[in-house]
């Protein structure tokens, strides 16, 4: 039997989410929880999924992936941190090209993995939608797809890396 508590605690003028398992908030306990339980929360605003922004739809898709793959949020967070680090490096006046190349290489690897998982999730959703259509004799088809440059060009690591390198001057502005 496990006692799981989730609460917030004020720390340095900010609130921090605390999760404990049997009164233990260690990293090992949290790893155990993440490996043991998958969960997915649907909210009322999700009905507007198809009218909302692309980032909202990506976040929804990411939550679906996380429900079956507990390490997915770690992948997303690592990707976002790498993007932030790249931007900081680009905005500094003197930077090490080798370090920037290493960060951009990590961005490529993580980005391609995220893209692959999102495509797999969309394929699963499409299969389920098709099954529902067939089971209930629906008179309409619904097919979800990703509409972006990756889909059209089936981008690989080298192209992704080249795009990052070529966009350094532009990205430096942000």
Could you say what each language-model-derived stretch is?
Residues 1-56, 62-68, 72, 130:
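Nucleotide-state sensing region of NTPase/ATPase domains
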Residues 10-11, 16-17, 27, 78-81, ...:
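Context-gated lysine
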Residues 15, 57-58, 86, 107, ...:
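Short, cationic motifs built from Arg/Lys/His that form the positively charged side of catalytic pockets
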Residues 30, 54-58, 83, 100, ...:
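Alpha-helix initiation and N-capping motif
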Residues 33, 37, 53, 86, ...:
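Generic structural signal of hydrophobic/aromatic residues within well-ordered alpha-helices
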Residues 95-174:
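Conserved NTPase motor "head" modules and their coupling/switch loops across ABC/AAA+ ATPases, GTPases
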